[in-house]
Amino acid sequence: MKNRPLLRSLLFLCCAVYACGKSSNGPSTPVAPTSSISVSANDSLLTYPINMVFTQEVNTTHTTLISGQYADTSSKKGSLSIRLVGDTTGLFKGNSLFVTYTDGKGNVYYKTGDSTNFVQVDKFPKTYNGVVIGSFSFAVSSSAGAIRFSNGSIIAIYQK
């Protein structure tokens, strides 16, 4: 009789441990890291929610493409493409940096020869879904006008 409360306690403890046990519904699905490209463009703030990084061969030159865009379902239009010569961290300026910006009206802008144009890549893991981190500032122009991109930040996902 005296052991009955002890027995109930042990039974309750076993049930609690079993209920709190880890579920074995298979391995958890890894969550893809979030990405963002944000920049001040003249007097506006642009933020691209879909951002990816690719390494590509252009003719015989090894390049890195950093791409920012809106979702196909978004009412916002436009994109930003930054191409760098090489695939490493560091400061990219001059002929090692190419920029194409398309605004919401479809106007296409290209990097100017401004000597202050730069892209700084601080982190570049070359693994699938690795997070590439950097910053940038540059000017682009077209027949529609000129735009200064400043205080830009890159958090983009490496694809290949």
Predicted regions and their residues:
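Surface-exposed helix/loop patches within compact recognition domains
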Residues: 37-40, 44-129, 141
